[in-house]
Amino acid sequence: MTLWINGDWITGQGASRVKRNPVSGEVLWQGNDAGAAQVEQACRAARAAFPRWARLSLAERQVVVERFAGLLESNKAELTAIIARETGKPRWEAATEVTAMINKIAISIKAYHVRTGEQRSEMPDGAASLRHRPHGVLAVFGPYNFPGHLPNGHIVPALLAGNTIIFKPSELTPWSGEAVMRLWQQAGLPPGVLNLVQGGRETGQALSALEDLDGLLFTGSANTGYQLHRQLSGQPEKILALEMGGNNPLIIDEVADIDAAVHLTIQSAFVTAGQRCTCARRLLLKSGAQGDAFLARLVAVSQRLTPGNWDDEPQPFIGGLISEQAAQQVVTAWQQLEAMGGRTLLAPRLLQSETSLLTPGIIEMTGVAGVPDEEVFGPLLRVWRYDSFEEAILMANNTRFGLSCGLVSPEREKFDQLLLEARAGIVNWNKPLTGAASTAPFGGIGASGNHRPSAWYAADYCAWPMASLESDSLTLPATLNPGLDFSDEVVR
């Protein structure tokens, strides 16, 4: 029984699904997808639970959310192992994900008060008030790269605001989704407030097609995000928050410390085996001897990165990708770039057949025409050279995406110029592209999405503002508008 609907664990009526460790092949989870009727059942449960949940005070809802945070803390080791084994990421990185889940809850609570709480302004004849109200029933689609942390970036603010939820984890991380849901169950969520439906494309299509849905919160690929946008087009009554991918540029201008710049680049491009939406995909390198020295050092250090199993000791920097298929897609992308004329500096290699252990790849594309503006979701870095900083900015903006952008340079003036001209939701200076703060917005423009699914800004799309003009008594104004006559004379 792997679906959680209206407070009960039930068996899915759809296709059977098996999840294996992407490195060892060990069977981790088995279950059945939710059928279309079960998706509708989850929606009815969420709709029925909404009025009571929304009418609870914020303090009452907050108690449940904080109880969940405590359960995350007490079950940290177990959840870390589940996420690591299912995604293939090393233990250390899965542990940072669970820590981020815990820390984000307190920030989400503070954000609700600051951004979407209640305000009152006194007026000469009354008061103006601002309140926020929940949308209703929301669908949350989770990604596989951070199967606990990123869905919770939607779920926690949505619950605090008073919404009820139908959560569909990625079909590649059903075990993590179930493990997190069981902690919510222990936290004491009333039946129907949060429902879990497992499944792939068919389940997702059934969920997004529900007429009685008030909104959809999505983190994942641009292709799926575009499909959801088309599916919900013509329905402005439904909130649609999309956090999608990026073809992110990292500009290496002047470098004072080559090793520090190489470390930043590796953290930007290869952490999580390149499976972060903010990862650097395009390295824009200033032409010249210093750029040559930097690139040679980057290749040398990257060559030492050997992916390993989640529990290897000593711990590896990167683990496997989410699946062997995902790893093979990266290799295929590299082969296509090489066939276009790219010069391979470091070839990505699958270490073992039937696993997802893939070494990083670096390929120079300077002077190659027609390179696709697509996100390769894995450890593959493409390199272009530039001559002037103005050219670097033009190259950085030459994408339909707009998620993250970074600059390595000692010159503040160049960063100020980039801040003015960059088309990206995240613009960093001498910091990895993959770094993020829950108190700052997280998201992009263009094909990278619309709203900002971090703890702080997620509050904005989880509730709608209600304005009120109020007075505790009704009196006739001392001064009337022209043409109004309230005298006692009878007009004949």
Curated annotation (Swiss-Prot):
Keyword NAD: yes
Enzyme class name: oxidoreductase
Keywords on record: Arginine metabolism, NAD, Oxidoreductase
Coiled coil feature spans: none
PROSITE patterns: ALDEHYDE_DEHYDR_CYS, ALDEHYDE_DEHYDR_GLU
Family annotation (PANTHER family): ALDEHYDE DEHYDROGENASE-RELATED
Role according to the record: Catalyzes the NAD-dependent reduction of succinylglutamate semialdehyde into succinylglutamate.
Protein name according to UniProt: N-succinylglutamate 5-semialdehyde dehydrogenase
Species per Swiss-Prot/TrEMBL record: Escherichia coli O9:H4 (strain HS)
Phylogenetic lineage: Bacteria, Pseudomonadati, Pseudomonadota, Gammaproteobacteria, Enterobacterales
Gene that produces this protein: astD
